[in-house]
A protein has these predicted regions:
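Conserved small/polar residues in nucleotide/adenosyl-binding loops
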Residues: 284-290
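Conserved metal-phosphate-binding beta-hairpin within the catalytic cores
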Residues: 177, 188, 243-275, 285
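Active-site nucleotide/adenylate-binding loops and adjacent lid/helix of ATP-dependent enzymes
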Residues: 1-14, 42, 52-53, 96-182
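ATP-binding N-terminal substructure of ATP-dependent carboxylate-amine bond-forming enzymes
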Residues: 1-102, 109, 121-128
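A short, polar/charged loop-to-alpha-helix boundary motif
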Residues: 207-208, 276-283
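Phosphate-binding site of ATP-dependent enzymes
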Residues: 154-237, 258-265
């Protein structure tokens, strides 16, 4: 790239201390390789191994830190304090996007469709939760990404074990009504939606979980996505509203479902999506704007 020097010295922030460290290392390596190949003066920077004060002297930061500490507004706040420009969503939008409950509250307040949910614990009246939300349920740690700690629950007697699994990763756990249908993901670049991708996990996994996202080679990514042109445009517009509602900007991803009646439901926002070879967004297939 002829004007790569305009970016100056770029820190590719990767790794970190979250449960998604290994994914971040893989994503960061892919981003670093693509930047260097494009002629950018880029270096890997792992906040687990180095003090963030060592970022002084870098001109920009490309954030590829997944999960807590990197996707929740913390590193964004440090970079703003150091006056270093960075990629993606700012402090507030990152903090909201990392919190599944706050994200859903904002979407609900904006009249955007998202599945009913409850915050739960082992002390909750689990029979009441099942009566209210029905079965199946999806149990999620509120502040984790990459499907870490998530479980699909089809029988009420399995709910306590799923909560215990989720609480290994987060003190706050939610139960969400399971949406049966087709899953889609919509990436954003420069704040605008890209073509919709249909996700088709293998038949032997319950949902698009951590293993399917990063360890399996038999997940199908459908482009075209199988929606009509009108439906795809409707989903893109819906996800753009959802992306903007939480204060996300730059690049990111929204995951959504279409139920058996054809209705769309918003699942989650990802302000720093995975960029590994297994991810629905691979940095090596993107080009830097000139």
């Amino acid at each position: 790239m002829s004007n790569a020097s305009k970016f100056g010295k770029v820190a590719v922030l990767l790794g970190g201390k979250s449960a998604e460290r290994e994914v971040s290392l893989d994503s960061g390596a892919a981003v670093l390789e693509a930047l260097v190949r494009s002629g950018v003066n880029a270096e890997a920077f792992d906040p687990k191994e180095r003090s963030v004060t060592e970022l002084v002297g870098y001109d920009r930061a490309f954030i590829v830190l997944h999960g807590r500490g990197g996707e929740d507004g913390q590193i964004q706040g440090v970079l703003e304090w150091l006056n270093i420009p960075y990629t993606g969503t700012g402090v507030q939008g990152s903090a909201i996007g990392m919190d599944k409950v706050k994200t859903k509250q904002i979407w609900q307040g904006s009249d955007l469709p998202t599945a009913p949910y409850r915050i739960i614990s082992q002390e909750s009246d689990l029979a009441e939760v099942v009566a209210n939300l029905g079965l199946p349920l999806i149990i999620k740690p509120v502040h984790e990404g990459s499907s870490v700690g998530m479980s699909k629950v089809e029988k009420a007697e399995d709910l306590a074990a799923a909560i215990a699994k989720a609480t290994q990763h987060d003190a706050v756990v939610m139960a969400e009504k399971w949406i049966t249908g087709r899953e889609f993901t919509i990436s954003f670049l420069n704040g605008q939606p890209l073509p919709v991708i249909r996700l088709q996990p293998p038949a032997d996994v319950a949902f698009y979980d951590y293993e399917a996202k990063y360890q399996r080679n038999d997940v199908e990514y459908g482009i075209p996505c199988g929606l009509s042109t009108e439906e795809e445009q409707k989903l893109q517009a819906l996800c753009l509203r959802a992306f903007q509602a939480v204060g996300a900007s730059g690049w990111g991803r929204i995951d959504a479902m279409q139920d058996e009646q054809g209705n769309f439901w918003l699942l989650e926002v990802n302000t720093v999506p995975g960029m590994t070879s297994h991810s629905s967004v691979s940095y090596t297939h993107l080009t830097l704007p000139t």
